[in-house]
């Protein structure tokens, strides 16, 4: 299958005139392999409808695609326009409030702030889904989607899961995010890497493009980049694994991933339960596939790719020699010598032993069975969503390898649509959806607007979604023996079916429920039962470390030296669980409010928690007064959270040096136009890097503005707040939206994440807090 892009034939164009993508909410269909704990609340899936859409609507979609393509090197993240167009039409939304502008030298009046805020509130309320959540794209890494295509190709399900229109949109996404040098970055804003260039290249070829095909000669340009940068022998370890699975690399060219890891005794420091959950979940199916030395069908395409991806005959590659090779463009975390020594020991001495009789029967077979037991457990406890997209594809493939016709694999196939998102830049794979995360902040932003009477229905639906999305049970059975922590009372990043507790998602969910409990039930619905709030508190208290900080998923505490064994080359801090400033600050704010409303419940434990957590935040401050943000870009994000947490804990500018230093950091980084703008490079470089040309970003501006409001900056000099608010107000678009700018999310120091909802949530919230907290003159 090959797609013509630049000039479609008239016949093809006529066939596609009536075609539209539609976002479906909270639907499970009649698939017998699909099930839910919560009637699919929060589920968001895209369907292609060949009959939908008027000529004007289809033209609007095509114009959005063309506009993205023409500006693809200037603004890399999508504006998430397809879902927005659909919802605004379904709600019959028309912005009836005229826009406002603040002229130079003009004061911001209360009326001006109110008008801008009301426009933002009405617009964003119209984007709410029927089940109460706010859908949004959550993607950005370019290694998410190709392995899914590769897995479906291997298993023979590519054309059923991804029919022609899906494949067209996948190719669109790949083409639209190719860098000018012909390669693809680790994420959409990143420099080209061997990992994502090779994966994207293989994906294009699987989807029917020839060696010289693709938009703008994409395939040939990608191949040239690969050959110019050392060929795929320089793939990082994850890439070598996927190439080995595809039959494009020999397993002997990969470092060992023995499944015997799952048989290790608990007293060892590298026992699975001591690993960070995502690290554990990635290497679980990887070790199964490695232990099996699984290789997919060697098709004519695979034989062609063997010729295209190397600069020497495939049979002549010295696999043993390329094991430690990695392109310099891919290296963020260089392996220490001790790690290479460990791999060499496993490769030379241990692995040959485990693959020979009698150990292949006595040990390897048992290890593979234990590994699959864990895979099935994790699959069942996430309703086959799994913990994330990287793990999803690997677990799905492992289930197929175990039994190609089995129910386990069919249940996995049924959940593939949960990961797919479509926007004007094409079809991509999400991390796993940010439904609860985005909705928690959206609700707080809307509540801060003090416009509840105008948006009561919106708030009631949001409240209902949050209540329904709380996890009601712990993982099944003896979950501790399966290396799992309690989850009852938590909120996940996405929806209840996902099942994985996250501390900051829990804190923000708890905060929403507590804020709603202060409001009339006839407006926002019945408040949550106290016992369920207590369960949430238990989760938060259980995740605090001795240093006062809060871990994200599971209790931290494994020895730090285990990070020396980080097997990836492009992530940092992935081996063990760590504490995070943002999680800690979120929990402080939630527990302070909980303590005020439920003063008798675990009072001493909560007070001890808050004291330790505040101290942790102070201890983590950087010399320049900032805090490093682990989940957003970067020091601006971390500082907003830290100042909010410290303020909630009773600290202020006068009694807390950390707040004074944090305030100075924000004031020192304000741009000339009144905003803030921080480059994503701050995250990997661990130092503040402004955007090029000192540009501002509205999301960063809102974070900084709210941080300064937390520190009560208005009591000292109100001008920086007015300047920031002016930029937010003047940047609002005609319909009440805000423009999409640079990427603002991150994970594991080096990989950026696009949160499409942030451009609405945070400018709205910033203006709301400004209007609420700052005395403004009346007109």
Swiss-Prot record:
PFTB repeats lie at residues 167-208, 659-700. One of its GO terms (molecular function) is intramolecular transferase activity. The active site is at residue 504. It comes from the Eukaryota. It catalyses: (S)-2,3-epoxysqualene = taraxerol. It is an enzyme of class 5 (isomerase). Pfam families: SQHop_cyclase_C, SQHop_cyclase_N. One of its GO terms (cellular component) is lipid droplet. Keywords: Isomerase, Repeat. Gene3D superfamilies: 1.50.10.20. One of its GO terms (biological process) is triterpenoid biosynthetic process. Its EC number is 5.4.99.35. Expressed only in the epidermal cells on both sides of the leaf and not in internal leaf tissues. PANTHER family: BETA-AMYRIN SYNTHASE-RELATED (PTHR11764:SF58), TERPENE CYCLASE/MUTASE FAMILY MEMBER (PTHR11764). Belongs to the terpene cyclase/mutase family. Oxidosqualene cyclase that generates taraxerol, a triterpenoid product. Taraxerol is probably required to coat the leaf exterior as a defense compound against pathogens or herbivores. This is Taraxerol synthase.
